[in-house]
């Protein structure tokens, strides 16, 4: 049985090196791996000994914490219905639908899967150890992220087929077209991130250790850059701003330098995780394997961001959006429908996202030197593809 356990854990640890802010699971034996300190010798007393004090039971560790998520499995968390303008109507010419009427339509963002979600965290880790069995720890550092998804996930919409004889839509016009065949990506800035957690070695038998942990993490990075890759309306915004809690129609100044009532776009990230893992010590190496259950949310207050455009038209245009039918107007130049052939008042919203899968596995190994220093390498699969590095020492 011992040989089988050794083989499974060693294979898991070696496999973790070849595959690749979420939260790491960590080694369940970590509270008892470093039993000596660089400044003070370790104490292995009995907690039931009346002569033992809390000073003998407590020790401190510090080190580097690096967590690198290459693909977090996320989906949107939105309603099934989405309010926007009436769908296009009419076999030819400009649309016959009412441009100022707000209706409920099927939400293309409902249950949509994100194509890519990355998060990179570098932090300092501080751990309070009790009786070489329990760890209470926190991390303080910085994180940055990247998100990419189909434009349907972000409710990218625009106005098309407007028959008004003008260079810009009316103030009460509402987007009537869903632009779902495009890509939206965003980059966040590097911002402060923190996490807290606890880990306990629940059961030990020889060199094997069964442990459990619980962690919570939080960060709120701002959007540094937003890219919309759409043939009908392609644009990039640095440090985007938008409207929170505002329904259609947006102000005609939306997307211009004259816009008011906007706020910086940011992502409020929260995650909590519980895990159970098993390790086996082999001299300097302690491989482990674990299972985890976690829930993460990315909330941007459903902020709506408008395409950048000019306040006043220049050569009768406010954006560089291309024509759809190949001419400036479906109805012809200088007649009704001057702007009907280009996408107008384009905007998108940053929908709330959450974990698509709750369960995952983690495999890794810890290398201990002189019972004072340790380096842990871990990878996580199923609900995310991530790698974790932790280097620490005991005082």
UniProtKB/Swiss-Prot annotation:
User: Which keywords accompany this UniProt record?
Assistant: Cell outer membrane, Cell shape, Disulfide bond, Ion transport, Membrane, Porin, Signal, Transmembrane, Transmembrane beta strand, Transport
Q: What is this protein called?
A: Major outer membrane porin, serovar F
Compartments where located: Cell outer membrane
Q: Which InterPro entries match?
A: Major_OMP_Chlamydia
Q: In the record, what terms sit under GO molecular function?
A: porin activity; structural molecule activity
Q: How is this protein annotated for GO cellular component?
A: cell outer membrane; pore complex
Per the annotation, which location comes first and is thus the protein's main one?
Answer: membrane
Q: Which residues belong to the signal peptide in this entry? A: 1-22
GO terms classed as biological process: monoatomic ion transport; regulation of cell shape
Job description of the protein: In elementary bodies (EBs, the infectious stage, which is able to survive outside the host cell) provides the structural integrity of the outer envelope through disulfide cross-links with the small cysteine-rich protein and the large cysteine-rich periplasmic protein. It has been described in publications as the Sarkosyl-insoluble COMC (Chlamydia outer membrane complex), and serves as the functional equivalent of peptidoglycan. Permits diffusion of specific solutes through the outer membrane.
Summarize subunit and interaction data from the UniProt record for this chain: Part of a disulfide cross-linked outer membrane complex (COMC) composed of the major outer membrane porin (MOMP), the small cysteine-rich protein (OmcA) and the large cysteine-rich periplasmic protein (OmcB).
Q: Does the keyword Transcription regulation apply?
A: no
Annotated membrane topology is: Multi-pass membrane protein
Query: Which family does this protein fall into?
Result: Belongs to the chlamydial porin (CP) (TC 1.B.2) family.
Q: Which domain of life is it from?
A: Bacteria
Transmembrane segments annotated in the record for this chain: none
Species this protein is from: Chlamydia trachomatis
């Amino acid at each position: 049985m011992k040989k089988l356990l050794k083989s499974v854990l060693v294979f898991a640890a070696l496999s973790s090196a070849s595959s690749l802010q979420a939260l790491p699971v960590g080694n369940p034996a970590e509270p008892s791996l470093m039993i000596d300190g660089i400044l003070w010798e370790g104490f292995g007393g009995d907690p039931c000994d009346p002569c033992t004090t809390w000073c003998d039971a407590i020790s401190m560790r510090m080190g580097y914490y690096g967590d690198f998520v290459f693909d977090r499995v996320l989906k949107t968390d939105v309603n099934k219905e989405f309010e926007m303008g009436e769908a296009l109507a009419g076999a030819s010419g400009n649309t016959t639908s009412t441009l100022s009427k707000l209706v409920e339509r099927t939400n293309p963002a409902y249950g949509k899967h994100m194509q890519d979600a990355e998060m990179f965290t570098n932090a300092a880790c501080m751990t309070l150890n009790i009786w070489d069995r329990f760890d209470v720890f926190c991390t303080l550092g910085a994180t940055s992220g990247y998100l990419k998804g189909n434009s349907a996930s972000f409710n990218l919409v625009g106005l098309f087929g407007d028959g008004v004889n003008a260079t810009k839509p009316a103030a009460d016009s509402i987007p009537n077209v869903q632009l779902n065949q495009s890509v939206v990506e965003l980059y966040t800035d590097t911002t402060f991130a923190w996490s807290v957690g606890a880990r306990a070695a629940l059961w030990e038998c020889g060199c094997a250790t069964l442990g459990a942990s619980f962690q919570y993490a939080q960060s709120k990075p701002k959007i540094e850059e937003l890219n919309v890759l759409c043939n009908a309306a392609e644009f990039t915004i640095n440090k985007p701003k938008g409207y929170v809690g505002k329904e259609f129609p947006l102000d005609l100044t939306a997307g211009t330098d004259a816009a008011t009532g906007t706020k910086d776009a940011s992502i409020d990230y929260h995650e909590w995780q519980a895990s159970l893992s098993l390790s086996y010590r082999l001299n300097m190496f302690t491989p482990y394997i674990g299972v985890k259950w976690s829930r993460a949310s990315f909330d941007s207050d459903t902020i709506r961001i408008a395409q950048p455009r000019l306040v006043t038209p220049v050569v009768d245009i406010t954006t560089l959006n291309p024509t759809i039918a190949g001419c400036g107007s479906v109805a012809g130049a200088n007649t009704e429908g001057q702007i009907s052939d280009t996408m107008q008042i384009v905007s998108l919203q940053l929908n709330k996202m959450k974990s698509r899968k709750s369960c995952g596995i983690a495999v890794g190994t810890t290398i201990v030197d002189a019972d004072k220093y340790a380096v842990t390498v871990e990878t996580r699969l199923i609900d995310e593809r991530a790698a974790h590095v932790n280097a620490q020492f005991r005082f």
